[in-house]
């Protein structure tokens, strides 16, 4: 009765992408989705775009502000999924994610850190050494979850598309996973602290990591009391952020824009908008 002329109706559009979990999010940004094999190519609306930059500019390496608040499983799952969707050379996805909740395991890891940190302290001199001694460089026991992200350099065999001439690309890919997780965590109000002062072989032994697996990042994750307005090392006087224009070269190494830099006005506008550039 609803189709008296017995005409064939056009089939409803069905999203069939394996990444269909993205669709509800993008639908909220762009409106109705009308394709099953592509995502919109236009820029995000201003609010969504600004949220991405807000996560980037307000991301911090957290050491001292962790709260004893549990990260819900659904939030943790989103962070891991964001990490898993990092770009990777040859799509080899070389990462694994080792979650550490055990207080005993954390204590063993902190012991390794303290040993290495004292070794590191002796490598600095005079005022630098004194300042280093005052810095808190880990939140291993303070953070509810520790996470070791690793790289399996043999995951897809010895010959990897895109790694034939730059053998370190799988390591860099894993670092992209770290950054994805870090930015997603900031959007969720979760702090991340990267602890890198270990002897890698000792860390591997403590966590039972196989010989062929490379630990890339040991991260402390948790809700925080606050995010600092500037990086902690900058606030402590360790180093300052470098001017962007000193780091951008044109056409050949070392060639800055100088007085006629086409991006000069852009740098100034960025400083006014974000406080620094």
Model-identified regions with their sequence ranges:
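Small-aliphatic-rich amphipathic alpha-helix that forms the alpha element of a beta-alpha
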Residues: 79-84, 147, 156-206
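Aromatic (phenylalanine/tyrosine) cluster motif
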Residues: 19-21, 30
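Intrinsic low-complexity, disordered N-terminal segments enriched in polar/charged/small residues
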Residues: 11-15
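C-terminal helix-cap and adjacent tail motif
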Residues: 34-44, 48, 55, 62, ...
